[in-house]
A protein has these predicted regions:
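Residue-level recognition of tetratricopeptide repeat
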Residues: 3, 28, 37, 62, 71-72, 97, 106, 130-131, ...
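Structural signature of tandem alpha-helical TPR/SEL1-like repeats
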Residues: 7-20, 42-54, 76-89, 111-123, ...
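Structural marker of alpha-solenoid helical repeat scaffolds
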Residues: 24, 58, 93, 126-127, ...
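TPR alpha-solenoid repeat register
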Residues: 31, 65, 100, 133-134, ...
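Bacterial c-di-GMP phosphodiesterase catalytic domain signature
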Residues: 70, 124
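Terminal, low-structured helical/coil segments at or just beyond the last alpha-helical repeat
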Residues: 78, 131, 136, 143, ...
């Protein structure tokens, strides 16, 4: 039922169902992780962070929890060194994962390390040409004065997933449409 609600973007209802399930089984790291992801969708960022930290305590090898927490910090441009450490731990647990590599590239960009960000994001995009990775890679290219290549990457991302929120928001924010 939660999956159906997620697919139709009924985040609040999905969150409530997961919350009820987690009351019955409070130490289920996977359910807590799912609830954390729904908390983020309904802008309960503090709750998301608490839930992800609980997941990490319960299941220290849960790479996606480290990545989600680190990415959330990086995306909000807060506690960037902590974000980098969390994402680096996720990458240790699942080396080569393009989504985690994307997150590390994003935090490096937020830290002002554009060359390292570009290297990581190019690698992630080459492995998995995903629209969200395209959004991040394009933004780094844009910031480095490579607008034509950024537009090309974004166009590829739109072809793959025209409705991707991160890509759409990036283009609007940078006035790059």
């Amino acid at each position: 039922e939660v999956q159906v609600l997620r697919e139709v973007k009924q985040w609040e209802e999905a969150y409530k169902l997961l919350q009820q399930a987690n009351q019955r089984t409070p130490d289920d790291a996977d359910l807590l992780y799912e609830q954390a992801m729904m908390a983020e969708k309904i802008d309960q960022i503090d709750t998301m962070e608490q839930l992800l930290r609980r997941v990490i305590v319960l299941k220290p090898e849960h790479a996606h929890a480290y990545n989600a927490l680190g990415y959330s910090l990086a995306d909000r441009n807060v506690r960037l060194e902590e974000a980098r450490s969390l994402i680096a731990r996720a990458l240790q647990l699942t080396p080569g994962d393009p989504f985690i590599t994307d997150s590390l590239g994003w935090v490096e960009f937020r830290l002002g390390n554009n060359d390292e960000a570009l290297r990581l994001l190019r690698s992630a995009y080459a492995t998995r040409p995903d629209a969200e990775i395209a959004a991040h890679l394009g933004e780094v290219l844009w910031a480095m004065g490579q607008q034509d290549e950024a537009r090309r990457i974004w166009a590829e991302g739109r072809k793959r997933d025209a409705g991707n929120d991160v890509l759409r928001e990036t283009l609007v924010r940078l006035k790059a449409q």
